[in-house]
A protein has these predicted regions:
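N-terminal entrance/gating region of PLP-dependent enzymes' catalytic architecture
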Residues: 1-107
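Short, solvent-exposed polar/charged micro-motifs at secondary-structure junctions
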Residues: 59-63, 120-121, 155, 177-180
Length: 189
């Protein structure tokens, strides 16, 4: 943990599947932690590394890790008020604060998710439902994306039953932003 800031942001090493083989014996905590370090924590993307700037996960933020630990140990379910009124209250306070930060109306609603994939799934579901995209309207509906779109968007489309929409890919400008002229042209067609 002390070396996270200087650690590599990515390791291309492949997993050792034999480490995950199911068996009926026992392993000590130190053996399990070694497997975790060797096969989980040291391979692939290292979001807690000081060199990783791809997105903003929980990363190496100590207070965030302790919060996750506490919730996991006490097995809190903050998905509804009945099961964890305090956890739901914290979510509402944070959402109200975010509404103020972004000048959203007091009537705006939302939720805190585990990450961007679920956030995009919720947003696409909300858009589908708001515009009542169902049945024969699906194959006539158009979504505009760039080739730099996150892979979770295509997964979300499939999950919510919109895999048959028309997808128009837009060009990007020199700053990797969607080219507005390209968007306007595609919408006119």
């Amino acid at each position: 943990i002390n070396g996270l800031e200087q650690s590599d942001a990515y390791s291309a090493d492949k997993e050792n599947l034999a480490s995950f083989k199911l068996f009926t014996g026992k392993k000590s905590l130190s053996e399990i932690l070694k497997i975790y370090n060797d096969e989980i924590a040291s391979k692939g993307i290292k979001p807690a590394s000081g060199g990783h700037i791809g997105y903003i996960p929980g990363g190496g933020i100590y207070s965030s890790a302790i919060s996750d630990f506490l919730v996991d140990v006490t097995n809190e379910f903050v998905g509804m008020n009945f099961s964890c009124p305090g956890g739901v209250a914290i979510e509402h306070v944070l959402l109200d604060w975010m509404k103020d930060v972004f000048s959203f109306p007091k009537t705006a609603v939302g939720n805190l998710t585990s990450g961007g994939s679920i956030a995009n799934l919720i947003a696409m579901t909300a858009a589908r439902d708001k515009y009542q995209i169902k049945n024969e309207a699906i194959s006539k509906s158009v979504i505009y994306l760039s080739h730099q779109v996150h892979h979770c968007i295509q997964k979300a489309l499939k999950i919510i039953g919109l895999e048959d929409v028309i997808i128009n890919y837009l060009e990007l400008d020199d700053y990797s932003k969607i080219n507005i002229d390209s968007l306007k042209l595609k919408i006119k067609i």
